[in-house]
Amino acid sequence: MTDEVAALDQDQDSDYDGAWKEALRRFLREFLAKYFPLVYAAIDWTHEPEWCDKELSQVIGQAGKRNRQVDVLVKVRLLSGQEQWILVHLEIQSSYEEAFASRISLYNAGIYWICQRRVLTLAVLADLRRGWAPDEDLFQVGPFEYRLKFPVCKLIDHLDTDWRDDYSLPALLARAQIDALRTAGDALGRYRAKRNLVLGLYDLGYTEQQVREIFLLVDWMMHLRIDLEKQLTREIVEFEEARKMPYITSVERFAEARGEARGEARGRTSVLLSQLA
């Protein structure tokens, strides 16, 4: 068992998948602009994207869903006019998978078969395994060749280089994901990472609503032990009172969510994010 898999096994309460799905639904434009700028620039954003959950569930049901994997399928219109509409399949992969590229190829073909539309597949690698960034599925025998090449965004590489001082929402959520993985099994390390990320939000120029939205996503993703959750709650309350900035503590669920079942808190988080829109 690799260190990464062992860490994941120790951290089953953190809901990376749920946080990512909620974030992508609410901030698709921002995430595409940061993670895949060339794709973002090719889309006609005057037309509202359409989510294709039913079609995606058919493909995943046939191919089989893996752990630590988030898939979204959305129909968008291109600026080029080559095709009025295409399907963008975006997958976020939080752990190493040996047959990742071939499964991506299978999904791409399955979506095309079900929807009869061209599919643009994008992959966000949100794992800790350096040097692992598959971006092509290739099968060749004699004169026959099948090749699928897809864009990849490796979060840990960007965070260590060009995103080091980037505090946009997509970069912050990437940082929360990587910090959560790095501190799996390290309760105090997770607490410090989450505390630094949350308290740092107030000095980044975000509005009150934006701070709440980011906090709710980070809170969803970076689960803490109950005693450390309570300690962080106290620190946030004191911090906001000192600054007279009741951004997070004015969210109705803030105090009560800490003492309830994590599953209920996750469901309420999704509702609260919708209310903040």
Task: List each language-model region with its residue ranges.
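N-terminal alpha-helical segment
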Residues: 193-194, 214, 232, 268-272
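Charged/polar low-complexity intrinsically disordered segments, enriched in acidic residues
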Residues: 273-277
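Long, amphipathic alpha-helical segments that form or neighbor coiled-coils/leucine zippers used
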Residues: 215-258, 262
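Low-complexity, intrinsically disordered short peptide segments enriched in small/polar/basic residues
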Residues: 2, 245-248, 268
